[in-house]
Curated annotation (Swiss-Prot):
It comes from the Eukaryota. It comes from Mus musculus (Mouse). Keywords: Coiled coil, Metal-binding, Phosphoprotein, Zinc, Zinc-finger. Residues 336-361, 369-384, 1009-1030, 1053-1063, 1091-1104, 1119-1129 have a biased composition (Basic residues). InterPro entries: PHRF1/Atg35 (IPR047157), SCAF11-like_C (IPR057031), Znf_FYVE_PHD (IPR011011), Znf_PHD (IPR001965), Znf_PHD-finger (IPR019787), Znf_RING (IPR001841), Znf_RING/FYVE/PHD (IPR013083), Znf_RING_CS (IPR017907). Residues 41-81, 919-931 have a biased composition (Acidic residues). GO terms for molecular function: RNA polymerase binding; zinc ion binding. A zinc finger (RING-type) spans 109-150. SMART domains: PHD (SM00249), RING (SM00184). The gene is Phrf1. This is PHD and RING finger domain-containing protein 1.
Amino acid sequence: MDDDNLDELVAHSPGPDGPPRVGSSELASDAEESSNGQSGDSEDDTGSEQDDDTDGEETEGLSEEEDPEDRSGSEDSEDGVEMATAAIETQGKLEASSVPNSDDDAESCPICLNAFRDQAVGTPETCAHYFCLDCIIEWSRNANSCPVDRTVFKCICIRAQFNGKILKKIPVENTKACEAEEEDPTFCEVCGRSDREDRLLLCDGCDAGYHMECLDPPLQEVPVDEWFCPECTVPGVDPTHDAAPVSDEEVSLLLADVVPTTSRLRPRVGRTRAIARTRQSERVRATVNRNRISSARRVQHVPRYLMSSLLDETIEAVATGLSTAVYQRPLTPRVPAKRKRKAGRRKKVLGRKKTRSRSSVKSKSGSTRAKKRQHRVRKTKGRKLKNEVTARSRIARTLGLRRPVRGTSMPSVYKPVDPSLGLMRADIGAASLSLFGDPYELDPFDSNEEQSADPPSPLSAKRRVLSRSALQSHQPVARPVAMGLSRRQLPAVAPEPSVEEAPVPDLLGSILSGQSLLMMSSADVVIHRDGSLSAKRAAPVSLQRNSVTQSREESRLRDNPQPGALPSESASGGFVGDRQPNSGLSCGNRTALCCLPARIAQTPVRSDPSLTPRSGLSRTLSDENRPSRTHSSSPQLNGSNVRVSSASTKIVTHSSFPSKNTASGLPQRTGPRRPDFSKLPRIPKIHRDGNKSTQDQAPASGHIVELPSTCISRLTGREGPGQPGRGRVDSEPSSRGPQETGSHTSGSRPPAPSSHGSLAHLGPSRGKGIGSSFESFRINIPGNTAHCSQLSSPGFCNTFRPVDSKVQRKETPFPLFSIKKPKQLKSEIYDPFDPTGSDSSPPSSSPESLGPGLLPSEITRTISINSPKAPAFQTVRCVTSYRVESIFGTEMEPEPQPPSEPVSGMLELLSKGSAEGTSDLEQEGLGEIEPTEIRGSTARTQRPPPPDPWDDEDEVSCTPFFGSEERTVTCVTVEEPGVLPSPDAPQITTHRIVEFRASSRSRSTSSSRSRKKTKKKKKKVAREHQRTRSSTRSGSRDRTSRSVSPVAEEHTRRHRAKTKSRRSSSDRASSQDRAKRRKDRDDRDREHRRGSWGHGRCRRKSRSRSGSPGSSSCERHESKRRKRRHSGSRSRGSSLERDRRHKHRERSRERMDKQESVTRSRERRRWRSRSPSLEHRPRRPPSREKRAHSPEKKGPVREVSPAPATQGESRQDGDHSAEPPVSEVSVLPEVVSVLPEVVVADLNPPEVPPVLAEPVAHVPEDLDYGESVEAGHVFEDFSNEAIFIQLDDMSSPPSPESTDSSPERDFPPNPILPPASLPQDSTLPTIQREVLPIHSEDISKPVPQALAPSDQSLLKQDTVEITTTTPSTPAVVPMTKDSPVLSARGWEAVRPRDAVAQAPLLRSRTLVKRVTWNLQEAEHSTPAALDRDPRTPLQRPQRPQEGDWDAEDRALIGFQQAPFSELPPPIHVLQESGLPDADPSQPPGAPRAEGLPAAGTLHSAGGILAQVYSPNMPPPLAQPSSILPYALVSQPSVQLILQGTLPLAGCGTAQSLAPVPTMPATVSELAVPTTNNSEERTATPKTAAEKTKKEEYMKKLHMQERAVEEVKLAIKPFYQKREVTKEEYKDILRKAVQKICHSKSGEINPVKVANLVKAYVDKYRHMRRHKKTEGGEEPPTQGAET
């Protein structure tokens, strides 16, 4: 644009401009003259006006329209051009903003080549060709035949839109005569007549006219493509006019450069004329162009509210021919121009030296014609000028000169003072990387020019000869003024879309920008999950600081939309925050607004690295810019950005990362927060410092409210640089830098602070966060921080929608929802769960509902959301954010205090968690951060919004999801450093802390938690939280103790309904959590010290535990280490189990991660609907899981010691007792982990059976599950939205759920055993998810609980089997649970179907699956089956595949659990598992507690059932039998999640032991390992040694069974074909199984098994041939198998 402006100025200055232009494009213009002699009809006007056109001042239509006018000889072109220039510019801008989509996508008018958008449409009555109403009416004035097929028509049908109804028909008016007189006619070179204009072809080379009939031979059809007259077709005649091609390209370039040239840019890309270029078409185009320009001018100031009526008026006016008046060039100069042309044109031409060459070339044509041609030649000259203009524009771009901002006459110098992405591209990438080798070629559009200059291609050669008018005939004329939509107003709102559009067709530019990104330091580039790259350092700080710099950036953005990273970054951040923030900031600068959006969009991207925190701010900026890119123009309405550095920075931080800018709101005001940068360097310190710093800032910011949203995004990993809040941090470095660090550290909660303001932003940011998660967490975790940040701003729409900033901005509330959050939103908004207190709160409370409120459930969902893009890291991030636990409270409450910063919110959450034990938080560094204050205030602030749902869940509901607030604390711990620069690292630490905290806090005092919750309640959910808190205290304690008392159960139920005992679990674990937190903090500190990778690892670990697949590996290891340490201190067998679980979880999670993404997306949707309560619970359960770890590792020793003793029976009743609960919590936390999911789903169900008071108490263990889930599952859950959704689904049927929940809770007395099966609990968390539905059914059936211990034992076995069966129908498991008596035969009966359903799956993990299912089924066979069958439908049926997976997992878990509880039962189970598993009683269609839960159950069902359901039975056996079904139901969900996308439940369960091992693993891998892990965990509950041994044994047993199954399946074909003998069959089976069982991976990959078997078969065959009796060494294939 600037180039154009410069050109314009030059053109207007005859002296200097003339010579330079002539000099630069003299040859071109001469050549053009000869070829385009007629090109400039109004040469006088063309002189300067064409320059204007060339400059693109007319942007979209002017240059093209001008030419058509000139060509047509309508002298209006001169004045019209000038007027058109302004009008077109305006119109172009309007078009750019209102019509950001490429015109190529839509049907376009054959005459003006403009897409049908809002203009009135006219169609000839005789054909179905659509034209703009004014185009066809103008056409009909001279010819009444269709321009396309020449069909004669007498009426024109007017329609309001393309394919719209016919509003009216108007007769054709033939005004041809009059106009012919006025206009300067084109005469046929052969006959010399100017009639029959519709058949008077114009040569595309010289513009000479020829009638079709006068040609030799005559043409029968009007050529649509280029047509050259006989003269021009002679080779060599016009080759000299090589400039013409450049002019063609230039035209495109100019059009592209002009902001309004949205449609032209596209035409440039590939639009070609749709109808023949005749005098008629040219005249019509010129007239239409003029009319539109003038009408655009007229409409320019019409209020928007009048626009709608304008459409009708326009139609009327056009129909009545009023627009013809406009067409008749109100500009008087035209008539004189025509006459001048005739009389003095030649002189002018001579004077220009153009006419002569033209006339000489075209001497043949009459004098009139010659004059015309000469004029055209002049036009060509103008074109030459254009050419020069192009060169000029290139130079201008190089110099940083840009089109002056509207309203100013001086060109703006946009050259950034500091290197920006654009500059870097130009200086580093574009210049040196220029594909054309032109060091001066800085603009991608210029590259087009150069291309056109290349004469090689035939098309180029032809184009070379094209006259300007011919070239223009391929370009759309001025866009019709959209009467329906106020085009002008739209532009005002988002005038810059055109800026983005220019880059759209710019493939080269994107490549170059990518090159520049690649050339940047890896530290400055963020790789998003979607594979996109963005510059960490947004625009140079100086750019943002200086309005001039910003302006330049804007121009550069406009001119060089090329910075791929920039636009994307811009789009993501800008769109989110730009609109909102910018509207206020730049609303005064509307003119600049058009340009500004682009500039700003780019500016954020190009923010000074110094200004932008490298990991935090720069990430934010780049992410922010990404939204801006999409939204480039409108989002970056940062007029202030351009005008004032402070404003710009402010805008950048605010508009780019509204969500992330939770703290941004405050920082936003502090535009020049350069200090932040100094803080930013601390990002590495974020581990602890980031937390503290964040907290400090968060309180100061007062954006705590938004913390949830930001944290959620961060947790989700969506809140990356793209997060509006974060991106905008640029100007709030001081406050936001730390906050940002803190917020990232907080688990990507920073956006939350601005969540209320950027609710929409949060959504988009989140969506985007998916893509930019890595950016945010650049330092510590690859993408979590950035992604989280983005999440807040771009709505995972970046992920998914990150690029579509506009959409994201519009959908900001939904981007999260639509992308990954759609489900999240559901969960958050899940009204059905509002009563449950699930995640309803987030919707109600969070700007994200999705903002702070969203945090709790959003964290879960967010992770889920993240999971798709970067499940591993994002999930882990989520875990990190588990401060959300507190944030749940905080999230709801901090929403009002977004300024506080997500970290603040997170800290507040931590503080809340630490409210129970501030010392803990402080130990973890959260306390320092402002544990109580921020937690109290932020938590209250944030919590109040989500509290509605969460309150329902229980006060713990906030924390339940995060394992009471434990998880949040953990996250905060990571942030503990409080150094804004170290948000990433702290986040990692925080995440880890969260996990441990969750379990510790969960076990910790319920009252402490209540206290914390009380604070939260005080803020927003004071009353509800208090009620919840009281519930949590009694209920959570009840849950913790699994109290049998009805009151406790009621509390539990209420908490389930509200928190689903999630918070309870947190409360239980709170004291232990504290100890655990300290350990975690130490561990995390340790890990953080290990290095930035350690940070990422820590964060990932914590997230892993919470279900983050990607991060799970690192975090997992660290978690394991931590857990081992904790286990050691715990002195229980559970520590070993837990360690094992961690390992298993890591493995399974890794596997799960792969499958997780798939399932996650599916399940996430389901979960999102239910996710609110379920997610919160699961989140909390993971927290609990961590707490369990902590207590189990530290405090647990004291608590677990009683627990193991009471595991079998004491737990049954001890569960309800406060102390036992605590100890149980230490062990049970994991069991509860499993149950929490169920509880979550059973929030309502808990109320059902009073008899199940104890089970209900156990269900609170679900809170413990929350602990487990929180640590392991929640992250997985988060990463696997599906599970949450499914849990929600389970939860969705409240009454069935309630019913199920109670029985499940009834069984929880059995889970008293879970102390012993704490590892199982870890598995159970997963089961719990699935269990929800089963739980409901189970609750309705307290029979299993009533069963004698022996019965329960039987149940346990049956449950294990049922677990196998459950895959096909989880409902069966509950039935089995209910009818333990039928256990043996029930599981057997079920087994057949299981075998059938499971058969395919069995290949991958047949044995384990079958066993678990059979046990579970047997257990729940009759009553449970009946009950569950009906109940199951309530639960959303999962995919059959999910069911299968669940079955497998269940089999494993049940198997392991049963053996674990009672070795004999395990063996029995194993044997049974060998049998086909099918639960006939369970309807195959019956949803498996969600199908997904079935999978989850697989892992933890066995352990949980054995532990939870055997209170009456021997602790180990009884629990599995009673709990298994319920766990099974839940577990399938987890398993499915593991397979697909939601390892949440399964991972959660396994998580407590092995944070997310299960979840990260691929589905198949995960299924087996997870199952094994679950089984191991299940076995672990007894004693560390026992658990370990049993776990090992069961694991080996299951592995062996599965190996045997797989080997048999693989060898069967060979044996059937008699390729191997019976002896060989046995040998191969023995060797292969041995080989497989000794594989290091612990996985049984059917493909590898098949390869191994085949290798053995080949070996034996070979040996047979050589008569070798020895089998020899195993084939190397075995190694592959492992």
